[in-house]
Amino acid sequence: MKVTAVPAVIKPYESAEAIVQVSVQNGYHINANPPTFSYLKATELTLEQVPGISVSFIVYPNALTKSFPFAEKPLAVYEGTTEIKVRLRADKSLTPSIQTLPGSLHVQACDNQVCYTPGTLAVSIPLSIK
């Protein structure tokens, strides 16, 4: 699994959208947010606090609904490459600079037979303050 972030450009006292791309290998999927069953680990993006930058909201992609031999009903999942959108707001006191918004992507990967132990991947969103 690979996680990358599209650089975001933001101006003081304005909003911008950052995109975190999640690429899941063929033959695997990760649970959607929200997951179908409460015992499954949802894909969840958490971001650290950076002075002058606030996260307004996070938008998870629409899930695919697929049937698997190990599940009693179809599951909401992400496969292939999918995007998580992050709405950011910059404080008016920010000065032009390059910053990084660090975070973590919490996922539970599965194949067509079984779900694996949940894991965490590092995320780093490049920010250009204009």
Q: Model regions: which residues?
A:
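Extracellular/lumen-exposed scaffold segments
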Residues: M1-K130
